[in-house]
């Protein structure tokens, strides 16, 4: 069965269900169908799939299947073809489902998005219409933009109910229909074990990490923001004093006029919109001109304040933790990335930047472990 859950900002609007490639339905959350009821029924479905697969494995005659040293029962027949009697729920993004539906069985699901990523990790996005074109014999399906335009899900729910239903159904259909060709492609490219043994279980691990979150000392974060505000105010006055007038330091156009016309700094590059005040230009001038050094520090601190001090404070949940999103299908190298917020690029070079890391704390009785493979890609290639 193919499943798509239509969600936005934690709210569930409906679900697309593809029983097969001909029977596809949309169930909106309305009337007696509440979010809890719909998600509960989908959770029951996943549980039944898990139970069914467990029973089949127990009854399976191991002489009829090809043994895999890493698994008790293989998904491959003795002739090398894939078995499709194993039931599963197919989705474009299983982790998105797990935010609303509980399950701990990787073998009960098929994630078309992760499969598409393994087959072509260089793509920037994996949409259902792209998958259909590539894995369903060039089939053309209307893209999200064609069905909903630029509307949010909530806006589409209010104004384009038919388009929203079609979108949900196309996603469910694509996830189901792509299962066989994608699995065959994973086998052909030698990626089947990577998918089943690494990427599929990782979905559930990342989901658990997101739900658990990381503890933050909110008061220290607030204090950090106040320290930044004080220093930013000091720099602002210093810059205005050196410039001889007040101006908008965040305006490249105004800054360019001040630096390269009024103060006559050398090295200015004029464009159609004014002088360039890009970091690489200013960094060359900083050793000679104190005002430029102050401007660079001002930029760094205002970014720290908006992105980290204020930005992180705004995403602390009621449980006092930050629940980031971890992505496994974005980087071409397979590295996990973090968004909403990004916890992987918190600065460490500046003293004020290092302070931000101290607001993250482990659970009582635990410590943070910092582990890294040194130059792992080069070492693997050399091996």
Regions found by a protein language model. Give the residues of each.
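Conserved "right-hand" nucleotidyltransferase catalytic core of DNA-directed polymerases
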Residues: 1-32, 80-88, 92, 147-354, ...
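Short alpha-helix plus adjacent loop in nuclease-associated cores
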Residues: 112-173
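Short, surface-exposed loop/turn microsegments at beta-strand edges and helix-strand junctions
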Residues: 107-108, 349, 359-362, 383
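Secondary-structure boundary/capping signal
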Residues: 105, 139-140, 247, 267
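Intrinsically disordered, low-complexity regions
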Residues: 54-55, 62, 70, 144, ...
């Amino acid at each position: 069965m193919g499943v798509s859950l239509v969600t936005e900002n934690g709210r569930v609007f409906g679900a697309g269900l593809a029983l097969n490639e001909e029977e596809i339905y949309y169930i909106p959350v309305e009337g007696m169908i509440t979010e809890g009821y719909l998600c509960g029924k989908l959770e029951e479905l996943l549980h039944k799939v898990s139970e069914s697969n467990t029973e089949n494995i127990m009854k399976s005659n191991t002489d009829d299947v090809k043994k895999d040293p890493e698994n008790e029962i293989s998904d491959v027949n003795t002739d090398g073809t894939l078995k499709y009697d194993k039931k599963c729920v197919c989705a474009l993004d299983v982790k998105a489902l797990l935010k609303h539906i509980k399950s701990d069985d990787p073998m009960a699901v098929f994630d078309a998005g992760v499969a598409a990523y393994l087959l072509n990790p260089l793509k920037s996005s994996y949409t259902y219409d792209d998958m259909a074109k590539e894995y369903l014999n060039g089939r053309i399906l209307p893209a999200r933009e064609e069905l909903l335009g630029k509307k949010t899900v909530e806006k589409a729910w209010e104004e384009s109910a038919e388009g929203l239903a079609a979108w949900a159904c196309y996603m469910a259909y694509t996830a189901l229909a792509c299962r066989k060709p994608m699995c065959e492609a994973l086998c052909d490219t030698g990626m089947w074990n990577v998918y089943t043994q690494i990427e599929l279980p990782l979905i559930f691990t990342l989901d658990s990490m997101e739900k658990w979150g990381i503890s933050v000392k909110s008061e220290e974060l607030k204090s950090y923001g106040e320290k930044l505000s004080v220093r930013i105010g000091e720099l602002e006055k210093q810059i205005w004093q050196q410039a001889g007038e007040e101006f908008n330091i965040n305006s490249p156009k105004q800054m360019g006029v001040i630096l390269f016309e009024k103060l006559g700094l050398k090295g200015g590059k004029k464009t159609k919109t004014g002088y360039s005040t890009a970091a690489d230009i200013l960094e060359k001038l900083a050793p000679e001109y104190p005002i430029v050094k102050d401007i660079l520090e001002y930029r760094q601190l205002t970014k720290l304040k908006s992105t980290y001090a204020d930005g992180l404070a705004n995403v602390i949940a009621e449980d006092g933790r930050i629940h980031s999103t971890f992505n496994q299908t974005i980087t071409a190298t397979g590295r996990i990335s973090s968004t909403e917020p990004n916890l992987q690029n918190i600065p460490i070079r500046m003293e004020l930047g290092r302070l931000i890391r101290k607001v993250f704390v482990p659970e009582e009785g635990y410590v943070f472990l910092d582990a890294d493979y040194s130059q792992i890609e080069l070492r693997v290639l050399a091996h």
